[in-house]
Amino acid sequence: GKTLRIIMPVLNVAFVGSESLAKKIAKKGDVRDIESYVYKEERNGEIGIISLLRPLKHPEKIRPLLSVLNVAKVGIIEISKVDSALGEICVSFGCAKIEKGLVIINSQVGDWVDPEQVRIILEQSGLKNWELFEQLPDEHSIREKLFSFMDNLEREVSSLILPVDQFFNVKGVGLVAIGYVQSGTVSKHDTIQVLPADENGIVRSLQVMDDDVDTAISGDRVGLAIRNLREEALHRGCMVVHANSNVLNKNLSSTLSIIKAPFQKRVLQIGDVIHAAV
């Protein structure tokens, strides 16, 4: 059925932890490389939405984690043991400049996690302002903390940026592009521009979590049915923006300054191949 959406405040939370804790906090949505959990509550006369984005396959794959960090404003890290994967997670959040978050120690039977050791890791990885829970709080307390973060974040009025991670042709629908809305909103009948191909199309319809919607908002994983666009214009990693928004500039070459991350042992050498999440 058709779902009418009023633009509501949404808090995107990068969640690294167990499926069981995520399910307590919010309702599970679609699953690919990233699980999504959504919780809605009316507060002060408007609906607030908490959207947990839980990357899968870490530490084997870093890409889902980086995709989540690109759209998240705050974070939750659930700790069952201290290992190198935890260090990588904390450094990733620190490098992504996610300054607000909750760290929850939830050690399993027989595995004790030292809160002081965790505090040191947080301090060293740039997460010293995160709140540490030495034992698992109830889900209501976690939600209240997240809503307080939402209340303190400035409401952004930002332009549409939607990186595409897959696309295909659907019989009877046509060309469909799928990705997370990194910022802004996109609506039915909008004229969109695909970069770097620099070709325009029109949004025929949108689906979020298998519902037809009129508008998709920041943090949504959306399927965009597009007409008047060549399939060749799309590729994995291409960007969808509003036509004539000039929100992205084309650069043929860029100069980067690299800040050394905490715990980084290697120094970059000429000829090294690096993977960048921008």
State where each predicted segment sits.
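Switch- and interface-adjacent substructures of P-loop NTPase systems
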Residues: 37-46, 51, 69-72
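Conserved catalytic-core segments of large NTP-driven translation/proteostasis enzymes
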Residues: 125, 129-233, 239-243, 247-260
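Conserved G1/Walker A P-loop phosphate-binding module
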Residues: 3-45
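Switch II (G3) loop of P-loop NTPases
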Residues: 44-61, 77-80
